[in-house]
Amino acid sequence: MFVALGAQIYRQYFGRRGMAMANNSSVANKVCLIVIDGWGVSEDPYGNAILNAQTPVMDKLCSGNWAQIEAHGLHVGLPEGLMGNSEVGHLNIGAGRVIYQDIVRINLAVKNNKFVTNESLVDACDRAKNGNGRLHLAGLVSDGGVHSHIDHMFALVKAIKELGVPELYLHFYGDGRDTSPNSGVGFLEQTLEFLEKTTGYGKLATVVGRYYAMDRDNRWERINVAYEAMIGGVGETSDEAGVVEVVRKRYAADETDEFLKPIILQGEKGRVQNDDTIIFFDYRADRMREISAAMGMDRYKDCNSKLAHPSNLQVYGMTQYKAEFPFKSLFPPASNKNVLAEWLAEQKVSQFHCAETEKYAHVTFFFNGGLEKQFEGEERCLVPSPKVATYDLQPEMSAAGVADKMIEQLEAGTHPFIMCNFAPPDMVGHTGVYEAAVKACEATDIAIGRIYEATQKHGYSLMVTADHGNAEKMKAPDGGKHTAHTCYRVPLTLSHPGFKFVDPADRHPALCDVAPTVLAIMGLPQPAEMTGVSIVQKI
């Protein structure tokens, strides 16, 4: 009841906003974009709910004017080979550019040796060189890849050495959650080898488990353990020759990487002191907020430490840990200016976005570039998802309801751009129930068919794509359920007879090319921020 009422309010209020646009007649062609969730292209019939379903509409659309486009890995800003997902898919579709995830941006900087020219890193090194000559690196040292990566730390050490900072101290946070509990000693050995032999630069200053250094639940008594180790040397003392053995003894006492109590090296020199510079190198923000705020802001007071807080510290983060933090970051948030929704508003072209509850955020927040903002002339419609325990029990979900709302808009002709998401192939695909996924695909095809007929009747060009694969692989090789996304390409279809698809010159087309293609069909200019390309040309 509440969701339905919310949808009604959205329609009433935002419908008026949509009607306020004045330049809708400027478009060459009106476009209806459908994003199917979890519809990949695979010719393998085994466990393929899409191929084995009765889908005459999509069969027709994918036998005429269509293309297969990439929706996974580096093509959408994810690590190479990683399957796509709904959030990233809609970000790329709506942004008209590849939206690189932080780990990928950093990996590319490492690969291309860009750290030495990174503006914030250069700034941190200049501060250290022009001050007391001391710089600290602190973060999680492992190859877990969830919060940080050891390769990023190694690249930072090399760059800082090249940038000429006299003294570098490393504060090693043990993992044991995203890696095996006793694997830290191996990362410690790699680190010592790297500092002592590979670069001959930098000193290991402290070792402490992430349980203490990376708390995120306001357990400041935990943060205080790492804080006092870093500023005051509170912990068990050791040196480079003995620290590995200290950790092994901790393992023997059932103290694993995550829970390592502080081990202190370098004496007073390795402590965070007045006027020092600190770089935290975790790229995931949530577990860096407390320790960085304790060092660089007045949150050290929450630690209730009796030690004097060092004065004039300057903190930098690998990424932006919180918008209101005063720290510079090596990789600040990328600008998503002039995504498709914003650009249409700039062009005075109104638009309509529709989805059922499960995917409503994807056609609003994610499609709009990760912004909550609703642009001028943008109308939104929420269709309630069915209230069932699992969606295999109602595999059609609310596809018919979404189609109803889209057809209403096509008949009204108010908005030159309308788009929607169909959730069933993905949401039912995740249940692993093959027969239900077949029904989900068939229900989606019926809904698309109804919309297709309405676009033909009311003068809209229909485009159909997907955000990632899923329902085309419902069975694992051993016959068990496959419930994850896939790396298969997805379709992009176009019903307009005046355009044909062409491949970009230097790469395979991807989700980032959808928005530029929409603009080309509508006869609108493409903003400079969109680095995707239109993959159609006029016939």
From Swiss-Prot:
Superkingdom field: Eukaryota
Gene3D superfamilies linked to this entry: Alkaline Phosphatase, subunit A (3.40.720.10), BPG-independent phosphoglycerate mutase, domain B (3.40.1450.10)
Co-factor: note: Binds 2 manganese or magnesium ions per subunit. Cobalt and nickel are less efficient.
Keyword list, A-Z: Glycolysis, Isomerase, Magnesium, Manganese, Metal-binding
Temperature dependence, free-text field: Optimum temperature is 22 degrees Celsius. Active between 17 and 32 degrees Celsius.
Active site per the UniProt annotation: S86
GO cellular component annotations of the record: cytoplasm
Family statement drawn from the similarity comment of this UniProt entry: Belongs to the BPG-independent phosphoglycerate mutase family.
Organism expressing this protein natively: Caenorhabditis elegans
Phenotype upon gene inactivation: RNAi knockdown results in embryonic lethality. The few surviving larvae have sluggish movements, abnormal body morphology, developmental arrest and impaired survival.
Pathway where this protein functions: Carbohydrate degradation; glycolysis; pyruvate from D-glyceraldehyde 3-phosphate: step 3/5
SUPFAM superfamilies: 2,3-Bisphosphoglycerate-independent phosphoglycerate mutase, substrate-binding domain, Alkaline phosphatase-like
UniProt key word Metal-binding: yes
Binding site for Mn(2+) 2: D37, S86, D467, H468
Reported function: Catalyzes the interconversion of 2-phosphoglycerate and 3-phosphoglycerate.
Regulation of its function: Activity is not affected by 2,3-bisphosphoglycerate.
Co-factor(s): Mg(2+); Mn(2+)
Disulfide bonds: none
Summary of the tissues where the protein is detected: Expressed ubiquitously. High expression levels in the nerve ring region, intestine and body wall muscles.
Protein name (record): 2,3-bisphosphoglycerate-independent phosphoglycerate mutase
EC number: 5.4.2.12
Record field: pH dependence: Optimum pH is 7.5-8.5.
Reactions this protein catalyses: (2R)-2-phosphoglycerate = (2R)-3-phosphoglycerate
Entry's Gene Ontology molecular function annotations: manganese ion binding; phosphoglycerate mutase activity
